[in-house]
Amino acid sequence: VKVALLSDCYLPRLGGIEVQTHDLAQQLLALGHEVEAFTATRGAEGQMHGEVTVVDGVPVHRLAARMPWELPVNPWAPKELRRRLVEGGFDVAHVQTGVVSPFAWDCTRVTVGLGLPTAMTWHCMLAGVAPAFGVAGFVRRWAARGVAMSAVSEVAAEPLRRLVGDGVHVGVLPNGIDVARWAVGDPGERAPGPLRLVTATRLAARKRPAALVALVERAAALAGPGSLELTVLGEGPDRGRVERYVRDHGLDWVHLPGRVTREELRARYAASDVYLSPARLESFGIAALEARTVGLPVIGRQGSGVGEFVTDGVNGRVVDSDDAMAVAIADLARDPAEVARMRARNLAEPPAQEWSRVARLAVAEYERAVGLVRR
């Protein structure tokens, strides 16, 4: 089939949706499908106003406009998008959306208006905004008009199911991972030293990086001096706040190396012991899945998407509060044999979210979208 991938953001931006949409495009190409992407993100050299760039073999229509802070918004895009979708002979559209995705929502209005079969994947937790969305009614209307709805995890799908109402199927289309790329094998016997904690995240309030450092400080107090080392990978607007906390509290065992490449990320995970995922509103947690694929036990929050690939007490810990996370960290710092057991379990059982499977699930969503339009 010929697929139009529609997303506010795309490479060269490097957020979760951007990278997942790019990787999905690659997987669809490998399956023999034809793929083009449409985005409100400028190209690497500033391309916009509909210019087409090619990223790893995929034509990317840059329907970006000049906006403050290069926001991925273009109120003038729908007319041109409609023309390109009609002339392009697409079989199905796949919209990638978050809590606020004005370009993606404009795209959905266009595809629904054209009668183009449309799949829509939600990469966010809707619980907090579901009442407002319910009043606005647009999500329910799209579902009623045949948009095949999905979310990236069961916890993300549940509020969406309540929003669209009984009788409407909401699927789960998880984020995908290249297991072979992330698996590093058995690291061998661990060298003595502090429990090496790692996280990779955007340093923004929603991801709670400052709260993470504070709870790890509490864990260190429980486990004893020299028991922990924390590396926080990533950049974002809260970096200054986190740096001040580290400096003011004398936490010389907390490191903030910034953003790193995928290759360096994999190497850093392999050299660590435990991955931490403190966000409450994590709809999936692709970085945590990558770390789990390397072998790391993951400590995450109940009610987040981490529960899709972490079972409490089996290959990681799933906790209900920051205090409980601090206790779990301290417990593992005192019990290296338990860390090794969880790591061995992760290495022996690769995650189910392998890209080859996820790509087939995406194609199944496209087939469902076609069936809903023909119904």
Regions of interest found by a model, annotated:
Residues E243-V260:
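Nucleotide-activated donor-binding/catalytic signature segment of Leloir-type glycosyltransferases, i.e.
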Residues V155, G176:
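Carbohydrate-associated surface elements
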Residues R280:
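Aromatic "clamp/platform" in nucleotide-sugar-dependent glycosyltransferases that forms part
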Residues E338-A352:
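A short, well-ordered alpha-helix in the C-terminal region of glycosyltransferases
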Residues D312-D323, D331-P336:
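Conserved acidic donor-binding segment of nucleotide-sugar-dependent glycosyltransferases
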Residues P297-G300:
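Short hydrophobic beta-strand element within catalytic cores of glycosyltransferases
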Residues R259-V260, A267-S272:
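Short alpha-helical donor nucleotide-sugar binding micro-motif in glycosyltransferases
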Residues G188-E217, T231:
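Conserved donor-binding/catalytic core segment of Leloir-type glycosyltransferases
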